[in-house]
A protein has these predicted regions:
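Domain-level signature for proteins that mediate thiol-based redox and metal-cofactor handling
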Residues: 1-191
Length: 191
């Protein structure tokens, strides 16, 4: 199997494309010190020296490394784990198995209930249709957290988390787009 590698705007992350489905339940992120991970490929990649985060998108895997390490020393091990996983006949990394979805929802960061109103619905619609696809191309994800007093709070995940250019993307891209389409939005901040 040929796993393609794409660079992201974040020098500490790489996007791995196995050419197969990765997640059927939406984007999901795991951190190295999370003891509750029930996804075998996440555990295997995070057990490699220098990896600190693994992020599964629909058809890609983003891996974040420690800042002082070199990708050339790490890529082979990550690709090897991905190839090994799929060569054993596994179809997807994160499937729609309800038990697994429950496990994942318990291990993912604290999800707050989404406020229900027209502005929030419009924010989520724009995030889903215009912003998330662009962020996914860079190996990341953006999720809505809250809207209060004109301020939209979002969470950046995957390669976007800790990326040097994420503040510029947030202000010049996300904020400008949301303010353009939704007059009630005055600012966008990340948690």
């Amino acid at each position: 199997m040929m796993v393609e590698i794409e660079h992201t705007p974040n020098p500490d992350t790489l996007k791995f494309l196995p050419g197969k489905k990765v997640s059927e339940v939406g984007p999901i992120e795991f951190l190295k010190n999370d003891k509750s991970i029930k996804v075998s490929l996440a555990n295997k990649i995070l057990s490699l020296e220098g990896t600190v985060m693994v992020f599964f998108g629909e058809d890609f895997i983003t891996v974040k490394k420690e800042k002082d390490l070199n990708w050339e020393d790490m890529k082979h091990g990550i690709i090897s784990e991905i190839n090994d996983y799929y060569s054993k006949g596994n179809e997807v990394v994160v499937g729609k198995d309800l038990r697994l979805v429950k496990i994942l929802s318990e291990s993912v960061s604290d999800s707050k209930p989404v406020e229900s109103n027209a502005v929030v619905n419009k924010i989520n619609e724009i995030l889903d249709s215009k912003i998330r696809p662009a962020v996914a191309r860079d190996g990341g994800d953006i999720t809505f957290k809250s809207f209060k007093d004109g301020i939209v709070t979002v969470e950046l995940k995957g390669s976007c988390s800790g990326c040097p250019s994420s503040i510029m993307t947030l202000k010049q891209g996300v904020q400008n787009l949301l303010c353009h389409y939704i007059p009630e939005v005055k600012s966008v901040e990340a948690t």
